[in-house]
Amino acid sequence: MSIAIENNVALVTGANRGIGKAIVESFLDHGAKKVYLAVRDTNSTKELEEKYGDKVVTLQADVSNTASIKTLAEHATDVDVVVNNAGIGTPQSIISDDVEEDFLNQLQVNAFGLVRVANAFAKTLESNKGALVQLNSIASIKNFSQLSTYSASKAASYSLTQGIRTELSPRRINVLSVHPGPVDTDMAAKAGFENAAATSEISEGIVSALKAGDFHLFPDDMAKQFEKEYENFSNNIVTSDFSE
């Protein structure tokens, strides 16, 4: 199932900076009718509002709060493409006093946030024959030292993405799982990654992958190295139907 961004309405969580902001810009550059900017701080989208005018609509949303996401869905019933981009990640050793609190916080946003968004928008996306895009990571399939809790939360979100795809595909909803490597964002800088990919590589890749009807997207150079090694397992295990 494929969907073109042109003349469609999108919603992006965490739309005020980094990958989320780049997705908004790419969608509008490719002819999106309107993009909802779902953010915790509604004052953080002024730059996008000044640039795009009535093509963008800012809505308050917190993916760690179920009621907030339900309200968000009630205000965006015309949406065709929902991008769950909001996420958190901090360097954290597993062997530490505060690891449990840190891990729970990341699960609340990175894993349960996806569950909240998928549940809130499923009926709308079914009615509009739309798409759900989940920002996962190469850390979804490989645990990185000092990012172990982040990697585990993204592994959980990837597993959930597979389950969501199984449930939503029969309802004619396309699901796209995006797995970038380090991207030039505040999060990557804090983690000490160098030579990070430009945010536009991810956002432009999403536009193309949606049009192609793909399930996986490994958009940047490092991610493509993972894709090459992961492809056989993905084709034979992840996307296979073992119910037959």
Annotated model-derived regions:
Residues 16-17:
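Conserved glycine-rich cofactor-binding loop
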Residues 28-47:
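Conserved glycine-rich Rossmann-like NAD(P)H-binding loop of the short-chain dehydrogenase/reductase
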